[in-house]
Amino acid sequence: MHKKKHIKHGTNKQEIINIGTKSPTFQEKQRPSKTDQRSTVWREEQKKQELKVHRIFHPQPRTGFDVGKGIDPWLTTWQMITVILATLCIILVTKVGFLIPSLFSKGEKQSRKFSLLDPLCDRNDDSSCDFCSSDWIAFGNNFYCVFRENSKTWVESQSACEELNSHLVIIDSKAEVENLLLFEMDGWILHRMDGTNSSRLWGNDIKIRNTLMNDSEKKNHSCHYLRGNIFMPDECSAKKTYICEFNI
């Protein structure tokens, strides 16, 4: 009897517990409230925002490799820069290759050009030194200068050269003519018609222009000036540029 009562009593307790858990009031207590749900959502949003801010101020080191595409953007950029620099280097080398020969040719011309004729200036007063300018050109032991600003007669030209302890240029070789042609020197020269054909000295490149003249004209046209590779006879009273020569 006592056992049965005990069993019944335990059964009643279990039923009470089961009934209590199944009751609506108990289930409502077990469910999270709306306030708790909102706070949970807010915390999750706050964590997301904090994570974004952290990524902005503390970015992860770039690996430089896109796993999906298999392409390294940094490598591509450096390849483009390398190609551009290589192209520029090739262009510069090409330009330098074209410039060097021209510089050497200019240097050769400058080496044939003399500098100031200091020995000539030392022998004259200051006024005479005005004639000594960078127009003087050296060729071997000879210095030449063409005066283009003040045209003079043949006699005046010779006198002007003598004031500089020089004389009108005397051409006695083909090389000397080539030197004068190189620097485009035209003017009175110290050459007179003496019945000889001076062109034999220099071959067919140098020509003496002969014209039909009577005896009186020959006297008046006994002076010559150089124009290009041609000796031109003309009246000695004509005013032209002149070329002075100084020998050391």
Curated annotation (Swiss-Prot):
Keyword Transmembrane: yes
Natural source organism: Mus musculus
Pfam families linked to this entry: Lectin_C
Top-rank taxon: Eukaryota
Extracellular side: 101-248
Record protein name field: Killer cell lectin-like receptor subfamily I member 2
Ranges where the C-type lectin domain occurs: 139-245
Keyword Cell membrane: yes
Keywords, sorted A to Z: Cell membrane, Disulfide bond, Glycoprotein, Lectin, Membrane, Receptor, Signal-anchor, Transmembrane, Transmembrane helix
Gene name for this UniProt entry: Klri2
Subunit architecture: Heterodimer with KLRE1.
Recorded GO CC terms: plasma membrane
Subcellular location: Cell membrane
Cytoplasmic side: 1-79
Region described as Disordered: spans on this chain: 19-44
SS bond list: 132-145, 161-244, 223-236
SUPFAM superfamilies (alphabetical): C-type lectin-like
Lineage per the UniProt record: Eukaryota, Metazoa, Chordata, Craniata, Vertebrata
Extent of Basic and acidic residues compositional bias: 28-44
GO molecular function: carbohydrate binding
